[in-house]
Amino acid sequence: MIEVVAELSRGPVFLAGEALECVVTVTNPLPPTATSASSEALAWASAQIHCQFHASESRVALPPPDSSQPDVQPDSQTVFLPHRGERGQCILSTPPKILFCDLRLDPGESKSYSYSEVLPIEGPPSFRGQSVKYVYKLTIGCQRVNSPITLLRVPLRVLVLTGLQDVRFPQDEAVAPSSPFLEEDEGGKKDSWLAELAGERLMAATSCRSLHLYNISDGRGKVGTFGIFKSVYRLGEDVVGTLNLGEGTVACLQFSVSLQTEERVQPEYQRRRGAGGVPSVSHVTHARHQESCLHTTRTSFSLPIPLSSTPGFCTAIVSLKWRLHFEFVTSREPGLVLLPPVEQPEPTTWTGPEQVPVDTFSWDLPIKVLPTSPTLASYAAPGPSTSTITI
């Protein structure tokens, strides 16, 4: 029996273009007092990163596979295929790297191997939606002699920041370590430089604050004014807004605001409703605020953007956008006043009206959500940083 442990050195969340580092430890768990005949051997081990794509058949109409391209996937269980047994199709993969060959371990002995690979920058982000799913995994394949391959899969979460594809790593002193007493290899320099550049771009895009005001009205007049200080956010930030109802001519009885994502299938891949398809647009609510606001002059709300959510993106098949979805309940009666008189000549019981004629309407405000630091996003990652398998 051999135990294989894969541990990600920095957590399971990465930015596309960063270098993933994983330590693979192979151990013979028998006690050292066992006989030498209890030694274990592995023929080889290899590692590869791949992205698996899966689409809902009721929502997405994918083109049929090209019959001129034969299926070259072998049926043999002795061939290393990282996506073997996975749902969907592999749309992106890195070249496989061999970790070791002809490894023999005595009882109680263990050996560790380091795997490093740059995550492809041209791929989609990790996403589990109602129409499509993009799932990244690091797969480690191990094989005994004359035995099938055993696969160890480590789930990953990949964040994509648009605009880094065209950035070139400078080959000069601009990327030198901040301390002259520290030495970094070329890969470490590039990885830290890319993370620093991404942080600077995210800070520049999300730190600009300027008050934006929107007049809210229905067909009968002005309801109020909505104010928001910015429209670009990072994962983990709060969307803060204010609502001024004191200037409205139409009484607002209640309002709600929801932080939502809109997943939309591209027109060329939408399945027709008559062919058993479902709507090509789906919405997910991540946070919601509701308030009864009759006689309220000014109010505010704060909606947190979950660290575990996916920033907005667009591929050839699907797009994901963020928005604030407002719903207002207004009175049909002009000048609605439901306050008791200031002076009461005698004891009086005051009750609200049993029925109020109302109208409802909604409004959507698009916002932009960008990734955040992979280290910060790791706190919300559902997957562990260590995976184990026994052969």
Curated annotation (Swiss-Prot):
BP-aspect Gene Ontology terms: negative regulation of protein catabolic process; positive regulation of GTPase activity; retrograde transport, endosome to Golgi
Location(s), subcellular: Cytoplasm, Cytosol; Membrane
Keyword vocabulary terms for this entry: Cytoplasm, Guanine-nucleotide releasing factor, Membrane
Keyword Manganese attached: no
One GO CC term, this protein: protein-containing complex
Gene Ontology MF terms in the entry: guanyl-nucleotide exchange factor activity; small GTPase binding
Keyword Cytoplasm: yes
Function noted in UniProt: The RIC1-RGP1 complex acts as a guanine nucleotide exchange factor (GEF), which activates RAB6A by exchanging bound GDP for free GTP and may thereby required for efficient fusion of endosome-derived vesicles with the Golgi compartment. The RIC1-RGP1 complex participates in the recycling of mannose-6-phosphate receptors.
Protein family (similarity comment): Belongs to the RGP1 family.
Subunit structure: Forms a complex with RIC1; the interaction enhances RAB6A GTPase activity. Interacts with RIC1. Interacts with RAB6A; the interaction is direct with a preference for RAB6A-GDP. Interacts with RAB33B.
Protein known as: RAB6A-GEF complex partner protein 2
Species classification: Eukaryota, Metazoa, Chordata, Craniata, Vertebrata
Gene name in the database record: RGP1
